[in-house]
């Protein structure tokens, strides 16, 4: 297996719903680092697993859609907590739709992981293993 990954910064806002500290239930901002790691079973004819430029363009597009946005206002989070776990899921599914809408061949893709880093030492991720 081969893994290729990229990282980008992102600032989003959210508020937690439920029994949390007062500062967590009011809208507040996080400076996240989002990491996208793609795993493929074999390299293409050029010796690459995935095109880093394509990954960067797609991740940048998805990040532009949430940069500075209050996540709770997005339809995806209407019935979900705006946790970093669900933020990773949202980003992973958004990336899948971006690539699928272009007809990107997913037959070689085995998994991808989206990690959302909240600090230098804390992150949550979603691992996608189905690409249809």
Predicted regions and their residues:
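Charge-rich, low-complexity N-terminal segments
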Residues: 1-132
């Amino acid at each position: 297996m081969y893994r290729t990954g990229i990282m980008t910064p992102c600032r989003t806002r959210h508020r937690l719903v439920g029994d949390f500290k007062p500062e967590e239930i009011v809208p507040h901002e996080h400076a996240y680092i989002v990491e996208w790691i793609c795993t493929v079973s074999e390299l293409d004819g050029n010796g690459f697993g995935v095109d880093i430029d394509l990954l960067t363009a797609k991740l940048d597009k998805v990040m532009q859609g949430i940069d500075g946005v209050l996540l709770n206002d997005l339809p995806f989070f209407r019935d979900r907590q705006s946790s970093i776990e669900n933020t990773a899921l949202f980003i992973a599914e958004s990336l899948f739709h971006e690539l699928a809408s272009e007809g990107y061949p997913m037959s070689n893709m085995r998994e991808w992981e989206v990690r959302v880093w909240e600090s230098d030492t804390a992150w949550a991720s979603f691992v996608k293993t189905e690409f249809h």
